[in-house]
Amino acid sequence: MDFREASKILKVLGHPVRLEIVHNLMRDECNVNNIVKRLDIPQSTVSQHLRILQDRGIINPRKEGVITCYSVVDDRVREIVEILKE
């Protein structure tokens, strides 16, 4: 990974809500409502941050009937978050 790519990833993860969302999704995939309950923030805020994470290729949605579940798909992001947890 070059510095430009690393900078883009770090910029996205630089927001505390997005970092918390990614951390939660690393533990287990979940839908918007579960994230709202876990983080105690408005659904619209969670949806905005999920869209940004999805647009950057950090998370992917998966449909389960009418529910969309999200999971972290970028291993570089997983490594970064693991380092930050230490």
Question: How would you name each of these model-derived features?
Answer:
Residues 24, 38:
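Residues within the alpha-helical elements of helix-turn-helix
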Residues 19-21, 79:
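Pre-recognition alpha-helix immediately N-terminal to the DNA-recognition helix
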Residues 16, 26-31:
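Short capping segments at the starts of secondary-structure elements
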